[in-house]
From Swiss-Prot:
PANTHER family: DNA MISMATCH REPAIR PROTEIN MSH1, MITOCHONDRIAL, DNA MISMATCH REPAIR PROTEIN MUTS FAMILY MEMBER. The gene is mutS. Residues 799-824 are annotated as: Disordered. One of its GO terms (biological process) is mismatch repair. Pfam families: MutS_I (PF01624), MutS_II (PF05188), MutS_III (PF05192), MutS_IV (PF05190), MutS_V (PF00488). InterPro entries: DNA_mismatch_repair_MutS, DNA_mismatch_repair_MutS-lik_N, DNA_mismatch_repair_MutS/MSH, DNA_mismatch_repair_MutS_C, DNA_mismatch_repair_MutS_clamp, DNA_mismatch_repair_MutS_core, DNA_mismatch_repair_MutS_N, DNA_mismatch_repair_MutS_sf. One of its GO terms (cellular component) is cytosol. Belongs to the DNA mismatch repair MutS family. This is DNA mismatch repair protein MutS. GO terms for molecular function: ATP binding; ATP-dependent DNA damage sensor activity; damaged DNA binding; mismatched DNA binding.
Length: 862
């Protein structure tokens, strides 16, 4: 807590002193301070909220002699404002009135009852339905980094030990945390400054012993050996900081966080940050979801299934046994035609994973219980369908999903069919669930019958025809008589209120009944809230089994989704083998084929130990990048258990996928396009193995022709000779097509085009051999370059080709692609001019001068 100078506090009003004290306890957050029907913000908080939320900035009197900046928002609209703030990385402390204004001397007692941060959300209205909501922490050691993530909305807690900055960058790209904690000593700020929701934390929160003790306390264990993480020192320090932060913000027990998992990179195909970005797995290059692999594949029935699919896409497996179990399950659902039936059943489950987290945190609302009841009611039908399945994975999932008849019966008996949003005003517990509650409700709800009976009885006893019995919130129950008949009222009537033309009375009997009814309403509500709390106690012992059910249902959802996609999009089951190589027959790009207005041209690829590098040439827009990406995407899809867009596919082991495709300046780090390109190339050359899949596109284009060709040649040569990685190397340097003649394992393939007059038609079909032309000018014309510029370029190209043909007769036997020539084109007559500058005319004989004139003419023509 930030200390406050007591002398400074004395300058302010009592209310403002209360505010400043609470703000000092939460200096890094916006403080929503409850004032009647509004939340108010003051000083810098008010200015920031006004800017971020577009609300009016005003002033609220003076305190300490200066106007106080103030902004306010209605309490009933707070959830919408909170959603906006957490989406941009802001945290909020919500301060409520907890005292009674009627009995308070001075400011009403207030307390921070809720802290909302981007990484600790559980409220359904604030969460992104189809995305994990991860809180993360980084700790930097002398060698390497510790990284931990926690999804409080599911309880999933994962740590990773990372050796390099590149590995950390890849993890940040894979997990995309919405809030990130880092220590005061963290030095690689350029890695995280672009992220939203970064929080600097004191070094003591990362203390190793403190972290271990926090985790042991949370898990209720004597040591961490059972989790296999005892040696993960750096990541345990990060995990400890996470636990401290969550405990500070949630202010409640966290029983659903009862395990921690170590992420082992060796279990999955490693994808660096550039590869995840270039392949557009779950996020396109513009930051959206459209036209990504997830956009094509995600036809899941539940939000939790959608989130699991995205995790799978970022973590393709290497264990062929697990992969095969998924493929076989998908195949069975297709063969038995069960995927659609299961999809419809799963659709009604909702987001059980997040409901269970809210139950564990005791923040669930009545409708969460109703949704859980609905989900449990569907399990017998779901189990009947799964009973037709025989594959081991589907059988295992059926066992984990299970059935919960006792819990379903409890919720059926306890919760009304359509409960209100909040327990606050009651009406949640079903009649018949608890006899005492029914009695108190009967007293309250039976008032109408009693008042009708009392009115009839009093009319008869008094003979007053205008007598009525009524109720209002200010005066309670009353007997109303017209003033003309007021002289007939019995002495037992006590005047309560005089109105124009009427008098209102209370009787001892009515007074007793009033107290009884009002008391019954309060007691009914208090008892209902007590029964509500007991429901948590009755459900939570089954928390672990219910979480297993949610996780298994999500996995079943993804498997059903794979089956539906395979059937609808004509995917085929890949064959996973132990021999290195990739053989794909008639492969298709899963995204491009879905968005293309024309039929997609399928293409093969064949990579193995004797053919591990393909030099890919062809025109711009001919499909080189699409071809390379589809090889990577098909391989990745196979490794997550999905069928693939191809007639057939045989996929061997892959340890990493690298992509060096496209580039842009990294202005934040001061790196040029070429520097980014070379950094990514260096990463590939240092880390690729013979089991890596490498996509290299246009290496060397960001520098001079000679430098670029030299770098491209050397990189390709090193990949082919030393690493022997499975490589697709696209280039416009035609000289690289000579590599297959010099290096075993390298081969040429190309994508061709047909030229007619000034137009060009791209064939998009991959063929063996090198391309003969790049069609650069034709593509420029298609791009809208002015025709006079194209004509000038053709003239210049003709001059350069003529020069190169004369200067390089030795390569006439090679396929000609002069637009790819390395030789820098000299200015016309440059050689003749250079020759002239070396001549001394006074020393030439007439015969020498004549010979020199012919030579200069010849040079000028060249």
């Amino acid at each position: 807590m930030t200390s406050i100078d007591s002398s400074e506090l004395e300058k302010h009003t009592p209310m403002m002193r209360q505010y400043l004290t609470m703000k000092a306890a939460h200096p890094e957050m916006l403080l929503f301070y409850r004032m009647g029907d509004f939340y108010e913000l003051f000083y810098e908080d008010a200015k920031l909220a006004s800017e971020l939320l577009g609300i009016s900035l005003t002033a609220r009197g003076k305190s300490g002699g200066d106007p106080i900046p103030m902004a306010g928002l209605p309490y009933h609209a707070v959830e919408g404002y909170l959603a906006k703030l957490v989406q941009i990385g802001q945290s909020v402390a919500i301060c409520e009135q907890v005292g009674d204004p009627a009995t308070s001397k001075g400011p009403v007692e207030r307390k921070v009852v809720r802290i909302v941060t981007p990484g600790t959300l559980t409220d359904e209205a604030l969460l992104q339905e189809h995305q994990d909501n991860l809180l993360a922490a980084i700790y930097q050691g002398k060698v390497g980094f510790g990284y931990a993530t926690l999804d409080i909305s599911s309880g999933r807690f994962v740590i990773a030990e990372l050796d390099t900055q590149e590995a950390l960058e890849a993890e940040l790209q894979r997990t995309r945390p919405v809030e990130l904690l880092y220590s005061e000593d963290f030095s690689n700020l350029s890695l995280i400054n672009h992220l939203k929701g970064i929080r600097r934390r004191p070094e003591w929160e990362f203390d190793f012993d403190t972290s271990v003790n926090l985790l042991l306390q949370q898990f209720g264990t004597k040591d961490l050996h059972g989790f296999g993480i005892s040696d993960a020192r750096l990541s345990l320090q990060a995990a400890g900081c996470l636990m401290q932060y969550v405990k500070d913000t949630q202010k409640t027990a966290l029983p659903h966080i009862n395990a921690i998992v170590r992420f082992n990179q060796a279990d999955s195909i490693i994808l660096d940050a550039a590869t995840r970005r270039n392949l557009e797995l779950t996020q396109n290059l513009s930051g959206g979801r459209e036209h990504t692999l997830a956009w094509v594949l995600d036809n899941t029935a539940t939000p939790m299934g959608s989130r699991m699919l995205q995790r799978w896409l970022h973590q393709p497996l290497r264990d062929n046994n697990i992969i095969a179990s998924r493929h076989n399950a998908v195949a069975e659902l297709i063969e038995a035609n069960l995927f659609d039936e299961l999809h419809q059943q799963l659709k009604s489950l909702g987001d059980i994973e997040r409901i269970m987290a809210r139950l564990a945190l005791r923040s669930a609302r009545p409708r969460d219980f109703a949704r859980l009841r609905q989900a449990l009611s569907l399990l017998p039908e779901l189990q009947h369908t799964l009973g037709q399945c025989k594959t081991p994975l589907l059988t295992k999932l059926a066992q984990l999903i299970g059935e919960f008849p006792a819990e379903h019966e409890l919720l059926e008996n306890a919760i009304v069919d359509s409960p209100p949003m909040l327990i606050r005003d009651g009406g949640v517990i079903r009649s018949g669930y608890h006899s005492e509650l029914d009695e108190w409700r009967a007293l309250s709800e039976g008032a109408s019958d009693y008042l009708t009976e009392l009115e009839a009885r009093e009319k008869q006893a008094t003979g007053i025809s205008t007598l009525k019995v009524g109720y209002n919130r200010v005066h309670g129950y009353y007997i109303e008589v017209s003033r003309l008949q007021a002289d007939k009222v019995p002495l037992s009537y006590q005047r309560r209120q005089t109105l124009k033309g009427t008098e209102r009375y209370i009787t001892p009997e009515l007074k007793v009944y009033e107290e009884k009814v009002l008391s019954s309403q309060g007691k009914a509500l208090a008892l209902e809230k007590q029964l509500w709390d007991q429901l948590f106690d009755l459900i939570l012992p089954k928390l672990n089994e219910l979480r297993d059910f949610a996780n298994a249902a999500a996995e079943l959802d993804v498997i059903c989704c794979f089956a539906e996609r395979a059937e609808s999009l004509h995917y085929t089951q890949p064959q996973m083998v132990s021999k290195t190589g990739i053989q794909i027959n008639a492969g298709r790009h899963p995204v491009v084929e879905r968005v293309s207005s024309t039929a997609f041209i399928a293409n093969p690829v064949n990579l193995d130990a004797k053919r591990h590098m393909l030099i890919v040439t062809g025109p711009n827009m001919g499909g080189k990048s699409t071809y390379m990406r589809q090889v990577a995407l098909i391989s990745l899809m196979a490794h997550i258990g999905c069928f693939v867009p191809a007639d057939s596919a045989v996929i061997g082991p892959i340890d990493r996928i690298f992509t060096r495709i496209g580039a842009s300046d990294d202005l934040a780090s001061g790196r040029s396009t070429f520097m980014v390109e070379m950094t990514e190339t260096a990463n590939i050359l240092h880390n690729a193995t013979s089991q890596s899949l490498v996509l290299m596109d246009e290496i060397g284009r960001g520098t001079s022709t000679y430098d670029g060709l030299s770098l491209a040649w050397s990189a390709a040569e090193y990949l082919a000779l030393q690493i022997k990685a499975m490589t697709l190397f696209a280039t416009h340097y035609f000289e690289l097509t000579q590599l297959p003649d010099l290096i075993p394992g390298a081969n040429n393939v190309h994508l061709d085009a047909i030229e007619h007059d000034d137009t060009i038609a791209f064939m998009h079909a991959v063929q063996e051999g090198a391309a003969s032309k790049s069609y650069g000018l034709q593509v420029a014309a298609l791009a809208g370059v002015p025709s006079h510029v194209i004509q000038a370029a053709k003239h210049k190209l003709h001059q350069l080709e003529s020069r190169d043909n004369q200067a390089s007769p030795a390569v006439a036997s090679a396929p000609q692609q002069q637009s790819l020539s390395l030789s820098p084109a000299p200015m016309m007559g440059e050689k003749a001019l250079n020759k002239l500058t070396t001549i001394n005319p006074d020393e030439l004989s007439p015969k020498q001068a004549l010979d020199l004139l012919y030579e200069l003419k010849k040079l000028a023509k060249s």
